[in-house]
Amino acid sequence: MARKFFVGGNWKCNGTAEEVKKIVNTLNEAQVPSQDVVEVVVSPPYVFLPLVKSTLRSDFFVAAQNCWVKKGGAFTGEVSAEMLVNLDIPWVILGHSERRAILNESSEFVGDKVAYALAQGLKVIACVGETLEEREAGSTMDVVAAQTKAIADRVTNWSNVVIAYEPVWAIGTGKVASPAQAQEVHDELRKWLAKNVSADVAATTRIIYGGSVNGGNCKELGGQADVDGFLVGGASLKPEFIDIIKAAEVKKSA
């Protein structure tokens, strides 16, 4: 079964209500491949989720950028998976490298979050990736495998999981993993899933690439056999996000 191309736009901590409306209008007017070719998910900051959800075109979906690890309660400042479900938000991004690095989220904590979110009915974009120091030390796959294992130890059904490989050294830096570098890690990650989870999960789970993806490099990256789409940061706030969505066509013609 072919894996449907997936393009996620992570708006991070950006935007005003007016800016968000402009971005949504641009997306709503865009001519992009149909839903059977590409799945598009955008992830605005929490405060704009209802606005985006109510105004975004029906063939695009909305994701939160994070959620709490368990049921809500006395956790000031947190948002629970149940609240997202209540708002009819279908997706959530978990384990983003910025949260791992700045907020000290461990792989085990991320794994717990993924398992809890899935149990509440959310779909999860689970992020993994290595730092520049780890890559230069030759430990890329050790790091990525350990991060993935923390999820695999807690998750049995992978049908609602998309893995986002995001080399930390390429996020917001303008540095991009070459198509060959991205393909190598995606291929190794798929082999890890086959060996440690199941051949079926390895064959069907989408592994997307994140790290300075833009309109200029998306087609070559997307053309790699094991790159099933993108998690886009800065470029998702710009019109070139539409070009990145259109890169899904490379799979159709492959």
UniProtKB/Swiss-Prot annotation:
Give the enzyme's EC designation: 5.3.1.1
Q: Which HAMAP family match?
A: TIM_B
A GO biological-process term: gluconeogenesis
Pfam families referenced in this protein's UniProt entry, alphabetically: TIM (PF00121)
In this chain, where does the modification Phosphoserine occur?
Answer: 139
A single Gene Ontology CC term: apoplast
The beginning of the lineage is: Eukaryota, Viridiplantae, Streptophyta, Embryophyta, Tracheophyta
- Quote the InterPro entries the UniProt record gives: Aldolase_TIM, TIM_sf, TrioseP_Isoase_bac/euk, Triosephosphate_isomerase, Triosephosphate_isomerase_AS
Tell me the protein's name.
Triosephosphate isomerase, cytosolic
Gene3D superfamilies membership: Aldolase class I (3.20.20.70)
Compartmental location: Cytoplasm; Mitochondrion
What chemistry does it catalyse, as a reaction equation?
Answer: D-glyceraldehyde 3-phosphate = dihydroxyacetone phosphate
List of residues that carry Phosphothreonine: 131
Record's miscellaneous remark: In plants, there are two types of TPIS, cytosolic and plastid.
Which residue positions are annotated as catalytic?
96 (electrophile), 166 (proton acceptor)
CDD domains, from UniProt?
Answer: TIM (cd00311)
Protein origin, superkingdom: Eukaryota
Q: Which GO terms describe its molecular function?
A: copper ion binding; triose-phosphate isomerase activity
The organism is Arabidopsis thaliana
